[in-house]
Curated annotation (Swiss-Prot):
Keywords: DNA damage, DNA repair, DNA-binding, Glycosidase, Hydrolase, Lyase, Metal-binding, Multifunctional enzyme, Zinc, Zinc-finger. GO terms for molecular function: 8-oxo-7,8-dihydroguanine DNA N-glycosylase activity; class I DNA-(apurinic or apyrimidinic site) endonuclease activity; damaged DNA binding; zinc ion binding. SMART domains: Fapy_DNA_glyco, H2TH. Pfam families: Fapy_DNA_glyco (PF01149), H2TH (PF06831), zf-FPG_IleRS (PF06827). It catalyses: Hydrolysis of DNA containing ring-opened 7-methylguanine residues, releasing 2,6-diamino-4-hydroxy-5-(N-methyl)formamidopyrimidine; 2'-deoxyribonucleotide-(2'-deoxyribose 5'-phosphate)-2'-deoxyribonucleotide-DNA = a 3'-end 2'-deoxyribonucleotide-(2,3-dehydro-2,3-deoxyribose 5'-phosphate)-DNA + a 5'-end 5'-phospho-2'-deoxyribonucleoside-DNA + H(+). The active site is at residues 2-3, 61, 267. The gene is mutM. This is Formamidopyrimidine-DNA glycosylase. Monomer. InterPro entries: DNA_glyclase/AP_lyase_DNA-bd (IPR015886), Formamido-pyr_DNA_Glyclase (IPR020629), FPG_cat (IPR012319), MutM-like_N-ter (IPR035937), Ribosomal_uS13-like_H2TH (IPR010979), Znf_DNA_glyclase/AP_lyase (IPR000214), Znf_FPG/IleRS (IPR010663).
Length: 284
C-alpha cells in the first residue's frame, strides 16, 4: 500500500498539472471505484462537472482535490490505485476505473486500480480537510504536527511502538515499510512498549521517521512492482536504499548482522537483531 512518500509524490505531480483547471467531463467505469460515495456514480460525476480544482492536498495516505464551493474529491489509493495523466487519444490502461477531462484540453486524469481496494468520493471541506477524514491525525511532515502532544498520546497507548506508529489516529502516513526503516534508524525493536519511550527517545524516533520520509521523497517513493507509479507512470527507486525492509538474510548496513524477518500483525517486520535487540518487557 502506498505510504506517505508515495502519496506525496503523486500529490506534487497532480498539483503541478491540475490546479486551476476546470472539470468538463467525468466518467466512472467500475462501481467499486466510488463505493464510498453514497449517491452512486451518476451523482458523483454530475456534481464534478464545472468544478475548478483549487488545490491538491494530502493528509497521511489520503489525498484530495479541493474544489470550489467547499467540496473535495477525496481519494485513497488502497493497494494498487494510481492517478495517471495522459492525452485523451492515448490507449486506456487495462484497469481504468474513472477518468476526468478538463475544459482546457489535455492532459486528462485517469484513476487506475487493479485490485479495486482504492476509492473516490465527494466530501464537504471543514477547515480545509474533508469531513470524512477529520479523525485522521496530522502526519510528521505537517506543520500542525505537535511532537510533545504526540509523545503524550503515544505513551498512553500501552502497546508496542510499531503498532502505535501504524495507528492513523495517532500519526498518519506510516505503513509497514517506513515503520521498519525508522525503527532501524532509531535502534528500536518494534515490540518496545510505548510506556518505556522517553521524550528524548521519542524525538529520536520522530527524527528518524522524518529522515526516511524525506529520503524516500527524493527517490520518488518505493516501488516493488508496477502497482505504485507516479503520475507519469514512473516507478520510485527508494527500494534500493532500504536498510531492513525486504532484506531478510542480508547484512545490516550498520553492523553486518543478518537481517531477520518476523511475523507481525498478519504481515512481517524486518530488523537487525544486534542493533534492535528484544526489550526486557516486549509488547507483542
Amino acid at each position: 500500500m502506498p505510504e506517505l512518500p508515495e502519496v506525496e509524490t503523486i500529490r506534487r505531480g497532480l498539483a503541478r498539472h491540475l490546479v486551476g483547471r476546470r472539470i468538463g467531463y467525468a466518467e466512472v467505469f467500475h462501481p467499486r471505484a466510488v463505493r464510498r460515495h453514497s449517491g452512486g456514480a451518476a451523482d458523483f460525476t454530475g456534481r464534478l462537472i464545472g468544478r475548478r480544482i483549487q488545490a491538491v492536498l494530502r493528509r497521511g495516505k489520503y489525498l484530495w482535490f479541493a474544489l470550489d464551493s467547499d467540496l473535495a474529491l477525496l481519494a485513497h489509493l488502497g493497494m494498487s490505485g494510481q492517478f495517471l495523466l495522459a492525452d485523451a487519444a492515448s490507449p486506456s490502461p487495462k484497469h481504468l476505473r474513472a477518468r476526468f477531462a478538463f475544459t482546457d484540453g489535455d492532459p486528462e486524469l485517469r484513476f487506475v486500480d487493479q485490485r479495486t481496494f482504492g476509492g473516490l468520493t465527494l466530501a464537504p471541506l471543514i477547515a480545509d480537510v474533508p469531513a470524512s477524514i477529520s479523525h485522521i491525525a496530522p502526519d510528521i511532515l505537517d506543520v500542525a504536527f505537535d511532537e510533545a502532544e504526540f509523545h503524550r498520546r503515544f505513551t498512553q497507548r500501552r502497546t508496542g511502538v510499531k503498532r502505535a506508529l501504524l495507528d492513523q489516529t495517532l500519526i498518519s502516513g506510516v505503513g509497514n515499510i517506513y515503520a521498519d526503516e525508522a525503527l532501524w534508524r532509531a535502534r528500536l525493536h518494534y515490540a518496545t512498549p510505548t510506556v518505556d519511550i522517553s521524550a528524548a527517545t521519542c524525538r529520536r524516533l520522530l527524527a528518524a521517521l522524518r529522515a526516511v520520509f524525506r529520503a524516500a521523497l527524493r527517490a520518488g517513493g518505493t516501488s516493488f512492482d508496477a502497482l505504485y507509479v507516479n503520475v507519469n507512470g514512473q516507478s520510485g527507486f527508494f527500494d534500493r536504499s532500504l536498510a531492513v525492509y525486504g532484506r531478510a538474510g542480508q547484512p545490516c548496513r550498520r553492523c553486518g548482522t543478518a537481517i531477520v524477518r518476523e511475523p507481525f500483525m498478519n504481515r512481517s517486520s524486518f530488523r537487525c537483531p544486534a542493533c534492535q535487540p528484544v526489550p526486557r518487557r516486549p509488547h507483542w
